[in-house]
Design a protein with these regions (language model features):
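Non-catalytic connector elements of ABC transporters
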Residues: 1-72
Length: 72
């Protein structure tokens, strides 16, 4: 698949470093070239349908209306 245009401004290229599968939702950690980790929570079904595996190159797309913040 080739993306020719998209309206999401915040995009991070990276490589999947870890996938924590849950029964319904899974966490996917993507490491950017600068070493930052972007974590996405998506459905486990989407992980399977997208063929996501550790080591796969991906693009994380972040829409401002879908960003959550947690304390650490």
């Amino acid at each position: 698949m080739t993306i020719t245009a998209i309206n999401v401004r915040n995009q991070f290229r990276g490589q999947i470093r870890e996938i924590i599968d849950g029964p319904v939702l899974s966490e996917v950690d993507v490491e950017t070239p600068s070493g930052q980790i972007v974590t996405s929570v998506i459905t486990t079904r989407s992980v399977k349908e997208l063929g996501l595996v550790v080591g796969k190159e991906v693009i994380a797309l972040v829409k401002a209306t879908e960003v959550s913040i947690a304390t650490i």
